[in-house]
Amino acid sequence: MSKINKLEHIRNIGICAHIDAGKTTTTERILYYTGKSHKIGEVHEGGATMDWMEQEQERGITITSAATTCRWQDKIINIIDTPGHVDFTIEVERSLRVLDGAVAVFDGVAGVEPQSETVWRQADKYNVPRMCFVNKMDRMGADFYRCVEMIKDRLGAKPLVIQLPVGIEENFKGIIDLVKMKAVIWKDESLGAKYFEEHIPADMKDKAEEYRAKLLDMVVELDDHVMEKYLSGEEVTEEEIKILIRNGTISAAFYPVLCGSAFKNKGVQPLLDAVVDFLPSPIDIGIVKGMEVNTGEEKDFPISITEPFSALAFKIMNDPFVGSLTFIRIYSGKITSGASVINTVKNKREKIGRMLLMHANNREDIKEASAGDIVALAGLKDTSTGDTLSDIDTQVVLERMEFPEPVIELAVEPKSTADQEKMGLALSRLAAEDPSFRVSTDHETGQTVIKGMGELHLEIIIDRMRREFKVEANIGVPQVAYRETITKACEIDYTHKKQSGGAGQFARVKIIFEPLKEVKDLKDEDKNKTFVFESKIVGGAVPKEYIPGVEKGLNNIRETGVIAGYPMIDFKATLVDGAFHDVDSSVLAFEIAAKAAFREGMPKGNPKLLEPIMKVEVITPDEYMGDIIGDLNSRRGQIQSMDPRGNAQVVTANVPLAEMFGYVNMLRSLSQGRAQFSMIFSHYDQVPSQVADIIKAKK
């Protein structure tokens, strides 16, 4: 296969969904049918190939996204299996950043669940073309048509139904392919490897005709020539329909919807065909955004094998046999083991040691990789998640990833003082792997504090510390990660001088602090940031080389706010004026001046305390509704919606995280164990003043 041609044959896809929708099972079946896995792993038996960390096998949930390469027809499919639990949203986010397409798996019984919405929004953010697989069609209560309606209503997406289920619940036996207008039926033996095309059953003919007409109405809109043909009553060919479905999927005009039961081995091969037929190759994506290091110019770089090398490091993982592995997605050029590249974010050279193609937890050594490939590199010293690796002569920085702020924190200490150093090493390794996990030291108590996206997230970190690094730790009570912000703009003019003998220090800064939501001309790339710095210095009032000192000072000092010492977020600092001294000024002097300006200026901005608000969804039988709503209200919750789902009710509410500790036990006792809930971080909001007073008093 020629190198250029190879790009057309690659599909980089993610499989993402709500917890328990059947992602890992679907991926397992894909590996089985593409010949990469000789035994089907079952999640509920703890044997799934993709779930390879011990905790995943025990809990039956996928925690880290394992990358796997397999082949179908003449195509190479790189699959990233992503976690569906809300505490691991960061894993989904970073996978989506490097993928070209995704398969969203939905539970045929539950339909679109809260995490499905979150993942969908993340995929929207990165413009990832995707298709939908309605799984678990063999389960009691599965309803394909309701699921399609939910995709429309809840996700605001345009579903294009290309398959219909044949049989329902335990009688589910196959699908109707609306492109070929044939039924595909699985016989129960041979693990679903054998299936047969048949005529559409008589009792489904009308339904198939109805959905075929809907399909054609949607796809012909994309091509005037085919539309004319269709409207004049001519036959639209299978090939034409496939091309239009592909074009519409890649341009996100609609999302193809397929169905099946991965657990019962039905519907997986047509899903693979659809991945190959309809999801984009790297060539279809065409470009990647980045910046030329030499000129500082932002531009679109072509995804091509003939361009100089560039790649994005999207995951770091500790492998018990190889050590630290850095997963990269190559966007342009090629790379060979032993070559030197540059990390353009840190300006450090890296030498490529071993290069591996990963299959869940098995690895294959390779000597060369090129644009479109997803590979793991061993032996990189300075590269972390989100960094760019680039050709040394033609340096580029690819668009960075954004990582959410942690919402929960705990104090940890080793059970024996001998383990103190080991614990420090373990936590720094784990933080390098996971950018949504942070480690810091409390300056007042000297305690080590770990911060993450939820209780399960931190539980698993502590578990990994015990298993992988043999460190036993005592843990404190979970604490909410409060934040501070300002609510009005203020200006401060501060001069720092120290000129009492010896080398002096002098720096004057004039800074405007303002709430981000009040900034009129905020650039697109700053819209998701929690702190924005801008210099509007003209005429050299502050020399260019001192301005980074101002930004560094503000970045450091904002970690301890002025109300209760929590980090300050959601504000912009604009350096508008200043002064310097030829001899006594330095970067350090401007750093000190910026810190002092912050301390003096922030109290004038009417600072407020913020708390994380969680979107909580409770699914409960009717009879417990009253008690559950009453309890959510008592937790300062705001009910957003109440919807029937089957014979249950779904209550959605926004509730402060501080009020949600121990909720699982309360819900169990309120509903005799019949209700379930999920929660996900929504936003930060101001803390009511009486609650803020209690928080300040505790600090």
Swiss-Prot record:
Gene Ontology cellular component terms for the protein in this record: cytoplasm
Disulfide bonds: none
InterPro entries given in the database record: EF-G-like_DII (IPR053905), EFG_II (IPR041095), EFG_III (IPR009022), EFG_III/V (IPR035647), EFG_IV (IPR047872), EFG_V (IPR035649), EFG_V-like (IPR000640), G_TR_CS (IPR031157)
Superkingdom of source: Bacteria
Boundaries of every tr-type G domain copy: 8-283
Gene Ontology molecular functions: GTP binding; GTPase activity; translation elongation factor activity
Family: Belongs to the TRAFAC class translation factor GTPase superfamily. Classic translation factor GTPase family. EF-G/EF-2 subfamily.
Protein name: Elongation factor G
Keyword entries, A-Z: Cytoplasm, Elongation factor, GTP-binding, Nucleotide-binding, Protein biosynthesis
GO process annotations (BP): ribosome disassembly
Record-linked HAMAP family: EF_G_EF_2_B (MF_00054_B)
Gene3D superfamilies for the chain: 3.30.230.10, 3.30.70.240, Elongation Factor G (Translational Gtpase), domain 3 (3.30.70.870), P-loop containing nucleotide triphosphate hydrolases (3.40.50.300), Translation factors (2.40.30.10)
Chain's gene name: fusA
PANTHER family attached to this UniProt entry: RIBOSOME-RELEASING FACTOR 2, MITOCHONDRIAL (PTHR43261:SF1), TRANSLATION ELONGATION FACTOR G-RELATED (PTHR43261)
